[in-house]
Amino acid sequence: MIGDILLFGTLLMNAGAVLNFKLKKKDTQGFGEESREPSTGDNIREFLLSLRYFRIFIALWNVFMMLCMIVLFGS
């Protein structure tokens, strides 16, 4: 059960890190524009952009998970 949850989280993190979309921040149109609460789409975009910066740590996590799957969860 724990191995399945760790594997699911690892695969989900990998999928987010390797997305190759052109995600850009929305530009402000003028000086008078009031700041608004970021939408859900903006939050998802920021999260995916931040995952790109952590690719090396995600790769190290993948190696760690492979070792755990062999040592701990292997039969």
Swiss-Prot record:
> Where in or outside the cell?
Membrane
The reply to whether Signal figures as a keyword in the UniProt entry is yes
What's the domain of life for this entry? Eukaryota
* Cytoplasmic topology ranges: 75
Q: What is the residue range of the signal peptide feature?
A: 1-17
Topology relative to the membrane: Single-pass type I membrane protein
Q: Which UniProt keywords apply?
A: Membrane, Signal, Transmembrane, Transmembrane helix
Q: Which stretches of this protein does UniProt put in the Extracellular compartment? A: 18-53
Q: What parts of the sequence cross the membrane?
A: 54-74
The species this protein belongs to is Rattus norvegicus (Rat)
Q: Which InterPro entries match?
A: SMIM7
Kindly list the GO CC terms recorded for this protein.
Answer: membrane
What protein family is recorded? Belongs to the SMIM7 family.
Name this protein carries in UniProt? Small integral membrane protein 7
